[in-house]
From Swiss-Prot:
Main location: cytoplasm
Superkingdom per UniProt: Eukaryota
Keywords associated with the record: ATP-binding, Cytoplasm, Cytoskeleton, Hydrolase, Nucleotide-binding
Catalytic activities: ATP + H2O = ADP + phosphate + H(+)
Classification via SUPFAM superfamilies: Actin-like ATPase domain
Organism (species): Absidia glauca (Pin mould)
Name of the protein: Actin-1
Pfam families listed in its UniProt record: Actin
């Protein structure tokens, strides 16, 4: 891994349907996956299969028959912060395989995103993920 890549900013475009994530300076996103969180419909149905309490993205999509799916972003606006946090966690640790505290983070937001939502995004990035720097850009 080159020195530039180690400190490259992370860019995350949170869409209502798909989440796109990668590194600033790259030609294309490294990860594109559905913006969904799934939870088992029935407890115990997957006993012995290493059942998790939630699944994100493609894994949730592939197990949708036994999961209740939720879309935490509606019309570009985050409506479920716990699930959104799960999507960001999945983005950093599973898709990009980075430590968010080592990279500046750029997130996109919908043009009509309420100020309170921007504040909540900022709070989660700094307090939960310990991002060293954070910027919110309006989706164009």
């Amino acid at each position: 891994m080159s020195m530039e890549e180690e400190i490259a900013a992370l860019v995350i475009d949170n869409g209502s349907g798909m989440c796109k994530a990668g590194f600033a300076g790259d030609d294309a996103p490294r990860a594109v996956f559905p913006s969904i969180v799934g939870r088992p419909r029935h407890q115990g149905i997957m006993v012995g299969m290493g059942q998790k309490d939630s699944y994100v993205g493609d894994e949730a999509q592939s197990k949708r028959g036994i999961l209740t799916l939720r879309y935490p972003i509606e019309h570009g606006i985050v409506t479920n912060w716990d699930d959104m946090e799960k999507i960001w966690h999945h983005t950093f640790y599973n898709e990009l395989r980075v430590a968010p505290e080592e990279h500046p983070v750029l997130l996109t937001e919908a043009p009509l995103n309420p100020k309170s939502n921007r504040e909540k995004m900022t709070q989660i990035m700094f307090e939960t993920f310990n991002a060293p720097a954070f910027y919110v850009s309006i989706q164009a």
